[in-house]
């Protein structure tokens, strides 16, 4: 009997394609067990996406954990020699809490790590492999790139206190200019300094357009060094195809990333499929003087590509419809009225008809009226492309 690749699920086909890509690039497969001693995660909590870990006591009395992270285990055991660069790829399951379901999820990951001597060539290879990974997974993709050194350099130039930096990075990630400015002023910046910081929000767009602006915006040597590293990536990335964007509002966790960071998207998927960056701070806890860069591909996200559409989305229209999950109540009404004023209203009044789905095919928009707590679930499962929620729901999440 012949084996047909078409019978495989998208994530199964992806794993074969990515394995070939990484092995051709000189990476060796890294094998690890399902369990890790809990002490590793307890001692390195700041490097984890969540402090919640599934633990159990082994028969010999040791406290073990179902691994929530692969990179941490590789960083602990790799131990590259001076002058050596280790290249690994992995295909593992990790166990993390889901903000949407408030339960633990088993997540299938493939990833790539380069550890040891990590210079310009290794950085370029890792980022280009991230772009090629996206190219193998879909025809329409976007890779967004930023640099934590650039952001730290600007915070240094403005003398932002260390204890206020995590708050500012959180507001920067939210891309909310008003709250970003408020946080900047709370950190002790005057109006002109806050204006400089808020200008970061404009450094977002195509790589070729934004890079010269980022170079001109530099305030110190640390920012210039980061801009030079971004400039060195321009030519290799140009040959990668796809859409490459420079987004200096993209900020990783400051305890984890210290250089380039990047994340990748595929058309029709609501959140990043690929995330990565440079994490020298982590590898140096185990191997002093070493560097590291890598990324993970979240294969489970590819299941959405083969999932059946909700019945309302199967209706054929000439235009591609934007599906919006609106919370029932005042917030939903307010957002709907704002959108209606600029041409995105619907012929029928959902409050009058009590319908939970209304649409305007001419404007290419469809609204789902849902409980505020269900908005994230609609987006999570791909029924809606975007959702509107208030601060109370965000706080709960």
Task: Annotate each PLM feature.
Residues 1-32, 318-330, 335:
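Short, extreme N-terminal leader segments that mark the start of a protein/domain
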Residues 34-64:
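Polyanion/phosphate-binding surface patch
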Residues 28-32, 55, 243-244, 343-349:
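Short secondary-structure junctions
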Residues 7-25, 36-37, 71-82, 89-139, ...:
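Positively charged, Gly/Ser-enriched RNA/tRNA-binding surfaces
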Residues 106-110, 146-153:
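Short, conserved phosphate-binding/catalytic loop or strand-edge motifs used
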Residues 130, 317-397:
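Domain-level signature for soluble enzymes in the chorismate/prephenate branch of the shikimate pathway
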